[in-house]
A protein has these predicted regions:
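Membrane-interfacial helical/loop segments at transmembrane boundaries in membrane proteins
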Residues: 1-9, 101-119, 178-213
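Iron-sulfur-cluster electron-transfer modules
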Residues: 2-137, 144, 281-290, 312-316, ...
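Alpha-helical membrane-embedded segments
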Residues: 23-30, 132, 166-167, 212-249
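Juxtamembrane/interface segments at transmembrane-helix termini
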Residues: 31-49, 100-105, 137-155, 173-189, ...
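Membrane-interface segments at loop-to-transmembrane junctions
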Residues: 50-51, 55, 73-78, 112-123, ...
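Hydrophobic alpha-helical membrane-insertion segments
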Residues: 82-94, 160-185
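Iron-sulfur cluster-binding electron-transfer modules in prokaryotic oxidoreductases
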Residues: 199-210, 258-260, 265-271, 376-678
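Ferredoxin-type iron-sulfur electron-transfer modules and their immediate structural context
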Residues: 230-359
Length: 678
């Protein structure tokens, strides 16, 4: 090591190495203690198995953690983040090298010589300049642009950390720049050093004594800032710098499904309570989610409930619960909240209001947008489970849930009338399956297709299509219960289990190759919630295959004056990744002109939900979701909105009437449109 390295000098008679060791040991001890206190909170969480499919998790870690695939969904902010992230990674090696030299353990020195040193130093210097520009741009963007999605975030922390990162770049630039002017061997590496040379240009008028002071000060400020930054991270929203990669690795792999009431416990009667009331009722992974939130606001910016003025912000729920957790398990114990105080200050119904919890449509837009894979729906449903269990649910649910329990449908209609709609199809025989019957395709109609007159027309269209394609099919009729999708997502886990068990028993009694469904909600719950392995298809997938195989041939030309746009249902698109099948089916219809809305595919805007909104409306909202979605459809120039979900159809038809758009807009189900061309 060069004899005049800052750590080799003495200060007040004490070797610089001793000061470096003091800073190093003190910082690591403090950092370990802070992490331990954070671990205490995670350890208080419930069991959650997250070690399945290691290969898939590692691939996701690379794709979403290192490559940061989701960041550019917000292009400008995403590019800035990627630049700062990778600059921090590249400069991290430099900081470690400086610290190791200061500890007189220069294990990286052999690597920092020769050809690699020239390459690395050039790369490092380039990144220092780029990161400085990116930090400045990020600060100006926040200060001048003031994006709405940052409202409620800890703004000071964002500015402070950006300044710390920039300061790390500047201290190294001036450390190297002064070394270049002093011509120290350790710094005169072969290679282009733009950042160091820029600093040297700034310092070019300084005396040798001043340069030596800058060199020494640059070193000590750099390592002190590095360790201060390290310890500040777990105390701020930038804890995600440490927790983001683990959170992405332990992410939920399967979309559409919900976690059980408690992992590892199948019998609900074994549980003392259902759902979540306190932070320790969440799973350890969900608590890690709270630590990992970057407060970027992408979740709330894409939340349809938030967009129409409902009192729901996924970001603010995360921030509020995280901050309350920090108060409950603080770094130092003198402000620890007592158990008695926790009992009188409930999280659900207190910190998080009932309207926040019931405003969610479980559309998944927040989870689709989150760059660090925070899970919101499971948390919301867990809190609903607590409200249902303690009878704090909206009173409008009571009668509907009683109907589900007594009759297996939300209307309270007898099971004997579940298949009455098929009687109107006198020319088409519909087989009602009994135990032991066998068909190629089982059509699971579900409750709205069975009882609601408007949705029965969609079910009839599906039956007509099956008949025209000469498919051997049948329905369960009176033996079918509601799929339970809505029941589970409003938090009535016990009732869902009952409906599911009765349906599974009936399904096991029949033989079939595949199941098709009317709506994406039943499709999702049969595919992702039911334990019975079976091939489950939404009708759009099924009938597209029939068209592509030539078993169905659309021939009637659609009116060329009409312009169509397709609305992606949440539980078909985001939750199950089915975007192309409905569009390919539409493109197969002769004469149809299709245009896309700006918010489509995985950024589709929820219609209002096929779950809660069916039986409970939130008073605090500026407009209905379906009306806002209709505005988006009209902006494309379309006059016909196509959907593949009966609940979307119900909401859009109602919104067209309330908005007075009967002469301008029309909504049609994809299946009805297909049948009109056959």
């Amino acid at each position: 090591m060069h004899p005049v390295h800052p750590a080799s000098q003495t200060y007040l008679g004490i070797p610089g190495y001793a000061f470096t060791w003091l800073i190093f040991v003190s910082a690591l001890c403090l950092f370990s203690f802070i992490l331990y206190r954070r671990y205490v909170l995670i350890h208080s969480g419930q069991f959650d198995p997250r070690l399945s499919e290691i290969g898939k998790r590692l691939f996701g870690l690379i794709t979403y953690g290192l490559v940061q695939r989701r960041q550019p969904r917000y292009l400008w902010a995403g590019v800035l983040h990627i630049v700062i992230f990778w600059g921090f990674v590249v400069l991290g090696l430099r900081s470690i090298d400086l610290i190791s030299q200061g500890l007189n353990l220069p294990f990286l020195r052999p690597l920092m010589q020769g050809g690699f040193a020239a390459f690395y130093n050039t790369l490092k210097d380039l990144f220092e300049l780029i990161v400085l520009v990116a930090c400045t741009a990020a600060i100006l963007r926040r200060a001048i642009g003031k994006p709405e999605r940052y409202e409620g975030s800890h703004q000071f922390e964002a500015y402070f950390v950006l300044c710390l990162i920039a300061f790390l770049m500047i201290t190294d630039m001036f450390y190297e720049g002064s070394a270049l002017l002093l011509d120290k061997p350790e710094s005169s590496q072969v290679g282009w050093l733009p950042a160091s040379q820029l600093a040297a240009l700034v310092l070019s008028g300084c005396t040798p004594g001043a340069l030596r002071s800058v060199h020494v000060l640059g070193y000590w400020l750099h390592i002190f800032t590095f360790f201060f930054f390290l310890n500040y991270l777990p105390l701020s929203k930038h804890f995600h710098i440490i927790t983001a990669l683990p959170n992405i690795f332990f992410r939920k792999l399967g979309k559409g499904s919900l976690k059980p009431a408690r992992w590892g416990i199948e019998d609900l009667e074994e549980l003392e309570t259902l759902g979540v009331q306190r932070i320790e009722d969440f799973t350890w992974k969900h608590i890690l989610d709270f630590f990992t939130c970057t407060e970027c606001g992408r979740c709330s910016d894409n939340c349809p409930a938030n967009a129409i003025g409902r009192p729901l912000s996924p970001k603010m729920i995360t921030i509020k619960v995280r901050d309350s957790g920090y108060e409950k398990v603080p770094i130092l114990n003198w402000k620890r909240v007592s158990d008695k105080e926790n009992e009188t200050s409930p999280m659900v119904g207190g910190l998080i209001t009932h309207d926040e919890i019931w405003s969610c449509t479980t559309c998944g837009a927040c989870e689709e947008e989150c760059p660090v894979f925070i899970e919101y729906i499971d948390k919301i449903v867990d809190m609903r489970r607590h409200l249902i269990e303690t009878s704090q649910n909206p009173k409008t649910f009571n009668q509907v849930l009683m109907h589900f329990e007594k009759t297996g449908n939300p209307f309270g209609k007898p099971a004997a009338k579940r298949a009455e709609w098929v009687k109107e199809m006198e020319d088409i025989p519909v087989k009602i399956l009994q135990e032991g019957d066998e068909v190629d395709t089982l059509y699971f109609v579900d409750s709205y297709g069975s009882y609601d007159p408007r949705i029965q027309s969609i079910a009839s269209s599906i039956v007509k299509g099956l008949h025209m394609a000469e498919i051997d099919f049948g329905i369960l009729g009176p033996n079918e219960k509601d799929s339970g999708h809505q029941v589970r997502r409003i938090g009535e886990e016990g009732l869902f289990q009952l409906l599911m068990e009765e349906n599974v028993e009936v399904l096991k009694g029949c033989k079939f190759e595949q199941v098709i469904t009317t709506d994406p909600h039943a499709f999702n719950t049969l595919k992702n919630d039911y334990p019975m392995p079976m091939t489950t298809l939404h009708y759009s997938e099924f009938f597209l295959a029939l068209i592509e195989s030539g078993r169905l041939r659309p021939s009637n030309v659609v009116d060329g004056k009409d312009v169509y746009t397709y609305h992606d249902p949440c539980y078909l698109g985001r939750h199950n990744g089915i975007y192309d099948a409905p569009r390919k089916l539409l493109h197969s219809l002769p004469g149809l002109k299709l245009v896309e809305m700006e918010r489509s595919r995985d950024r589709s805007f929820c219609c209002g939900g096929g779950d809660i909104i069916l039986w409970h409306e939130i008073e605090q909202e500026d407009m209905r979701m379906a009306e806002k979605r209709l505005q988006m459809a009209r902006q494309t120039g379309a006059n016909i909105l196509v959907t593949a979900c009966p609940f979307c159809l119900i909401h859009f038809e109602d919104a067209i009437k309330t908005a007075g758009l009967e002469d301008e807009m029309k909504v049609v189900d994809l299946m009805e449109l297909l049948i009109s061309t056959l």
